[in-house]
Regions:
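Hydrophobic transmembrane alpha-helices of multi-pass small-molecule transport proteins
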Residues: 132-149, 290-309
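Helix-helix packing/entry segments at the starts of transmembrane helices
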Residues: 50, 106-112, 180-195, 246-280
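Glycine-/small-residue-enriched transmembrane alpha-helix faces in small-molecule transporters
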Residues: 2-46, 154-178
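Hydrophobic/aromatic residues within transmembrane alpha-helices
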Residues: 38, 47, 97, 103, ...
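Hydrophobic/small/kink-forming positions within alpha-helical transmembrane segments
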Residues: 25, 29-30, 60, 84, ...
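Transmembrane alpha-helical segments that form core, pore/gating elements
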Residues: 36, 59, 154-218, 224, ...
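C-terminal transmembrane-helix exit sites in multi-pass transporters
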Residues: 113-135, 273-292
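Membrane-interface interhelical linkers
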Residues: 1-26, 56-82, 131, 194, ...
């Protein structure tokens, strides 16, 4: 039996694409909020390792029961794995400082990626930046500044980390756009998962072998902490995160293959809305006024850039 979501789309299906996109961002926003919640119980490297193992199991089961294992072989391995490396670095910066910043700062920092895509499009893709894109960049810069609040006494590098994540996410988008358009969603997810697994294994080994100052370990236990005891609670969390991650990424990949990206991309920003809702449910937190205005500026900039690509 083959699932429709894995078949090659023969025509645009905007309603199906919209539903898939909303399901995808809903699942990923839930996962990302859960990761912040779990920073006191696990480490980034343990999380990546255990989650990746479960995702690999799910991928092979899905491939076996739907399209077969041939779909997992990339047509262009080098760009596929280069993109996966960009995503792995992106996640390192996105989750690395999660215990020190708000969920709103995490999400809005990551969603500066359309601004970086615009900046990188000229040197890497040969695209020209017109006045609308320049205005969007200015608006996005204002939003990022409001979000970072660099003049505050409590400002730290942790607040910059999600924006660096946005830069590497932009590299992923550009590689995907130029070299990976014909790859299967399962192929792309498999490559990402394999790279995440390697990052988890080598990161765990590095943290164990390299001697770090105890103050450094104490300030970033999620990133530099030793491998914690693998409890049933952590395993359940990693299994849940694996399911949410796989669901979210498959839905988003298929959504952008079954409708115009210029129509869907503005709706991608509903991730920030879902992230805010999950943050309220799990942490009882709501964004501050400056964070809210910053998010609005970043979303507006992304929408302007998207519509000018039509």
């Amino acid at each position: 039996m083959k699932l429709t979501i894995f078949d090659n789309p023969k025509e645009d299906r905007p309603q199906m694409a919209l539903a898939l996109l909303l399901i995808g961002v809903f699942a990923l926003a839930f996962q990302d909020t859960l990761v912040k919640f779990m920073t006191s119980y696990t480490t980034f490297w343990q999380f990546q390792t255990i989650r990746s193992i479960f995702i690999l199991c799910i991928i092979f089961i899905v491939a076996q029961t739907t399209t077969g294992f041939k779909i997992l072989i990339p047509q262009n391995p080098l760009p596929v794995f280069l993109r996966s490396t960009m995503l792995a670095i992106c996640m390192l910066f996105f989750f690395g400082g999660a215990s020190h910043i708000t969920v709103a700062q995490m999400g809005a920092g990551l969603y500066t990626y359309p601004l970086f895509v615009t900046l990188l499009a000229t040197p890497l893709l040969g695209e020209k930046i017109g006045p609308f894109r320049l205005s969007a960049l200015a608006l996005g810069t204002i939003g990022s500044t409001l979000l970072l609040n660099p003049f505050d006494d409590k400002f730290s590098f942790f607040q910059v980390m999600p924006i660096i994540a946005g830069l590497f996410y932009a590299f992923n988008i550009i590689i995907l756009r130029k070299y990976c358009r014909k790859e299967s969603p399962l192929t792309l997810i498999l490559a990402v998962t394999l790279v995440f697994l390697l990052f988890g294994i080598f990161g765990t080994a590095g943290v164990a072998v390299v001697e770090l100052d105890q103050n450094v370990r104490a300030s970033l236990p999620f990133l530099f902490g030793q491998w914690p005891n693998l409890t049933l609670f952590i395993i359940i969390f990693c299994v849940g995160a694996a399911c949410l991650n796989l669901l979210g990424n498959i839905c988003l990949s298929r959504a952008y293959q079954t409708a115009e990206s210029s129509w869907l991309a503005p709706l991608d920003f509903t991730y920030l809305l879902f992230l805010t809702i999950w943050a309220k449910i799990i942490f009882g937190a709501i964004p501050s006024l400056s964070e809210t205005i910053g998010m609005i500026c970043i979303v507006s900039a992304g929408v302007i850039i998207t519509f000018k690509e039509k």
